[in-house]
Amino acid sequence: MQNLPKWKIFLSIICTVFAVICALPNFMQVNSKFLPHDSVNLGLDLRGGAHLLLDVDFDTYLNDSMENLADTLRKNFREDKIGYKNLLVRQNSIQLEVRSPEELKPLKKIINKIDPEIIAEVNENKIKLSYSESRLNDLLNKVVDQSIEIVRMRVDSTGTKEPTLQKQGDKHILLQVPGEENPSYLKNILGKTAKLTFHLVDENANIEEAVKGHVPVGSMLVKGDSESHREYYVVIKKKVVLGGDQLTTASASFDQNSQAVVAFSFNNLGSKIFGEITKNNTGKRLAIVLDNKLLSAPTINGAIMGGSGIITGNFTVESANELALLLRAGSLPAPLKIIEERSIGPSLGADSIESGKKAGLIGFIAVCIFMVWSYGVLGLFANIALSLALLYILALLSLFQATLTLPGIAGIILTMGMAVDANVLIYERIKEELHKGVSNLYAIRTGFESAFATILDSNLTTLIVAFLLYIFGVGAIKGFAVALTIGIISSMFSAIIITKLLIDIWVKYFIPKKLGLV
């Protein structure tokens, strides 16, 4: 009589108890602080929600970078007294002319000092400046990565929505927000760059002339809305005296007239700059601009050294909260364009879950009937192992908070068949040994040993495919790969460990004369 391996018994009990504890939140409310509380995280197609594919407008970012670089070059050329003319930004490059060939060498030295990765193409007295290919790729990756983080902060400022954000291709971002019933809100907060800047108002400019297109050099015309919803224009200095990147907090509030405002505070550097601006420009107006639209242009009555203030405007409570959220999250490095939009209602997700349950239940019952009909008691053991495999899958999905999608349910159903396939392979090998006239114990041991290598090879091959699907796939394909991987691991454990243990217990304590396979 063989001895049962104690490590198998111990391992099986521990894994099963642990799986029950992890899977419990899917069936009932767990109040104990010592037990897991997370149920399976349902994907967009099961829970409903919003699906957006965003395009990062890298060309706009690059053009703005070139404009900033052009301003830096002008400043350095003036300081070093280098003569130039016709310095313009065109097609993501800077073009200029030097007045004499002798000025090319010091000009190149300045350019290399500012940014060594700028490529200078010289044609007689004309120079074209552009970024190298490697620098462009680095900038693109940086902009997309920053955009993903800022989108995450805007969409999930409270940390409860669990959005899915993935980079697709070179400059696309996939955003999925399960349970989001208001996609227009998402589009609104993502459609704004939220670049907050402070400018001094050009008090000497003629508004009427500026509206006609005659804007003074170094200034620009911005439009705002008055409390009566009438448009008005203000000419402001192009120079940004303070940026929104120095903000630390922003929140909706009310002024003394019970009007909605946005209260803000700067960091130490921002507070110092803000204090100097208000101290040196008392009596002048300071324009607060968001995405080139004027929010307000209050008159500076005196030095503000506390580093805080309010933004007034034609705000509702909702719009003030929205602006505060955008300012807290930070400005996007580049505008985002929505190139694909899908909205899935909760009822459709519920229908998908119900369909998945029916398909899984029908498949499970069909497999159980087939196994009992084909292999008798051993088929029953395979069904028990299959049930435990499903429990392990549910527990692992809950434990790791892997997102379960409709293709993921298909992956689980697929692993049900694979789990039983492993048992079928083992039982057929046992049957072959029994035909040779060997004992039950020898047939069982040899059947498991000879089938193990085949089962391992086939499952490893499938795991490699699942791994590749996860690496190169997106969205639902990743969900399928995750469910398939968890299913394969669970089914292998149940087929090789659980089934073998159940058969060993049956053979040892019930001593059957026949295994029911011949």
Swiss-Prot record:
Name-wise, this protein is Protein translocase subunit SecD
Q: How does it sit in the membrane?
A: Multi-pass membrane protein
Coiled coil stretches, renumbered: none
Biological process annotations from GO: intracellular protein transmembrane transport; protein targeting; protein transport by the Sec complex
A Gene Ontology CC term for this entry? plasma membrane
Q: Which UniProt keywords apply?
A: Cell inner membrane, Cell membrane, Membrane, Protein transport, Translocation, Transmembrane, Transmembrane helix, Transport
- InterPro entries xrefs: Acrflvin-R, SecD, SecD/SecF_arch_bac, SecD_1st, SecD_SecF_C, SecD_SecF_C_bact, SecDF_P1_head
Q: What does the record give as the function of this protein?
A: Part of the Sec protein translocase complex. Interacts with the SecYEG preprotein conducting channel. SecDF uses the proton motive force (PMF) to complete protein translocation after the ATP-dependent function of SecA.
Mind telling me which residue stretches traverse the membrane in this protein?
9-29, 361-381, 384-404, 406-426, 452-474, 486-506
Q: Which compartment or compartments is the protein found in?
A: Cell inner membrane
Q: Quaternary arrangement and interactors, per the entry? A: Forms a complex with SecF. Part of the essential Sec protein translocation apparatus which comprises SecA, SecYEG and auxiliary proteins SecDF-YajC and YidC.
Q: Which domain of life is it from?
A: Bacteria
Q: Which family does it belong to?
A: Belongs to the SecD/SecF family. SecD subfamily.
Q: Name one GO molecular function term.
A: protein-transporting ATPase activity
